[in-house]
Amino acid sequence: MKPAVKRLALAVPIALAVPGTALAQAYQCRVPDRIELPRPPRQDSTTVRAPVARYTLAVSWSPEFCRSQRGKAANDYQCSGKIGRFGFVLHGLWPEAAKGPSPQWCALEPRPSIEDIRTNLCMTPAPSLLEHEWAKHGSCMAVTPAGYFKVASILWNSLRLPDADKLSRREGLTAADLRREFVRRNPGFTESSVGLQVSNGGWLRELRLCYDKDFMPTPCPPRGFGPKGAVPLKIWRGL
């Protein structure tokens, strides 16, 4: 077991002590009886091995993703409605370096098992993405896919995510409004720990939640923090 997994195992009681923990962000997610392993992921950039200084938990707003990605085979579970209708889903957990390129593509083996995919499909409803996230990011912080997904799921299940549908109807919604609502629901965070990724048109794509190497919320680096303060924000409902 790598140090990252050990540290989070010790933090489990803290994570689960958060009041009102959300159990899932899927609408009636139903794991299919039969799941096929996707093709092995293709390494799309060079291997980087570097000390891990912090982590990013990337939480995707599924209606915005599916708005442009619906109809693609790799996104069928997430976007077709066959196994459920999704709001926020987990994109991935990424180890980050203090400076310079972050760790990536440390190993392509072992691959996630069918059981790994089945266990985590309602959290990340795309088998090919689960494969990719393990190979590109998880292999640099855990020995096995199961260990990596355990860390990610503990962080995921400790969150109380905002009611994005309700926020989307607020007139004059800003980036600060979303950050304040997230912090209200998750008192361990500050607004500086909540990065946002938006489209060129100002639509919410992802929350980028920042943790230190002990998996405690920490201020995000300026790069990638996203829109600040009173910058207008839009949220596509699509449900």
Regions found by a protein language model. Name each.
Residues G71-L239:
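Domain-level detector of nuclease and nuclease-like folds
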Residues G20-A24:
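Sec/Tat signal peptide C-region and signal peptidase I cleavage site
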Residues M1, A17-V18:
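Extended repeat- or IDR-based interaction platforms in eukaryotic proteins
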Residues M1-L10:
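Bacterial N-terminal signal peptides that target proteins for export
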